[in-house]
């Protein structure tokens, strides 16, 4: 019995350094710009992430929005003829935005594991349909088509090793459809397909200028916002009708 206990203790001690290595934290990441301003002219942007990983590592960089629940409707054939919305489907623990970029030495299967395909393990489909995995796969395809989820969303460049570390720089192409909130930027140091170290930073995105004014108006003064929106819509319709009337009279 004593020998068995000693063997078990030896195995635990042998595994301890490996667990410690797996939990290594990278030096602080530097993100440029440190915050994202969504103004009237915002149409997407490039986010640069720089840091250092242990020498001999490859790098995966990810940007993820806050987890949320998406409510959608599943389409199916009715009477075997018409495609219609059949029932509601909710996808929980799904990030609003998810971008991934990997250095050239990362194997495709490893990039997929830590990229969009890997989200299938965390996103849950809430529906009566028994084939939930297929629904999650379709959800991922939809988000990719909307350019909210992307693999190979940029480039990761490794610099020469120095003092046991490899500096890296990543450029992620942030989509134009970005909502205000806090976004997580994460760098993964990869060796032999496994994470040996990781680092994280937070990026805040916020409305500025006219979008901020309209958002505040909508939330804080809903009635006034509704009236102004109606007036603008009516005026826009009148202007367009005048333009068409003028073009018709000019044609005669």
Regions found by a protein language model. Give the residues of each.
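Juxtamembrane interface at the cytosolic side of transmembrane helices
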Residues: 223, 233-252
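Bacterial N-terminal signal peptides
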Residues: 7-16
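Extended, hydrophilic extramembrane loops/domains of integral membrane proteins
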Residues: 177-207
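Membrane-proximal low-complexity regions enriched in glycine and acidic/polar residues
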Residues: 77-179
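N-terminal edge beta-strand
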Residues: 23-42
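Short edge beta-strand/loop segments characteristic of extracellular beta-sandwich folds
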Residues: 48-54, 171-173
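Short acidic/polar inter-strand loop motif in beta-rich domains
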Residues: 68-70, 108, 190-196
């Amino acid at each position: 019995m004593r020998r068995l206990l000693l063997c078990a203790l030896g195995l635990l001690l042998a595994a301890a350094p490996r667990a410690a290595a797996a939990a290594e934290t990278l030096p602080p990441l530097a993100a440029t710009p440190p915050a994202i301003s969504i103004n009237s002219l915002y149409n997407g942007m490039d986010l640069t992430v720089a840091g250092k990983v242990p020498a001999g590592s490859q790098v995966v960089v990810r940007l993820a929005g806050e987890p949320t629940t998406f409510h959608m409707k599943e389409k199916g054939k009715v009477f075997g003829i018409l495609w219609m919305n059949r029932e509601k489907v909710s996808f929980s623990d799904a990030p609003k935005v998810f971008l991934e970029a990997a250095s050239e030495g990362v194997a495709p299967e490893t990039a997929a594991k830590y990229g969009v395909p890997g989200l299938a393990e965390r996103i849950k489909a809430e529906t009566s349909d028994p084939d939930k995995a297929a629904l999650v796969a379709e959800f991922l395809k939809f988000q990719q088509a909307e350019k909210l989820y992307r693999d190979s969303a940029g480039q990761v460049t490794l610099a020469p090793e120095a003092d046991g570390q490899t500096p890296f720089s990543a450029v992620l192409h942030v989509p134009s459809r970005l909502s205000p909130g806090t976004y997580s930027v994460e760098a993964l140091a990869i060796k032999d397909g496994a994470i040996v170290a990781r680092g994280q930073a937070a990026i805040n995105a916020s409305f500025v200028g006219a979008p901020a004014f309209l958002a505040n108006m909508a939330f804080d003064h809903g009635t006034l916002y509704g009236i102004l929106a109606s007036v603008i819509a009516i005026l826009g319709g009148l202007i367009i009708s005048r333009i068409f009337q003028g073009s018709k009279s000019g044609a005669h």
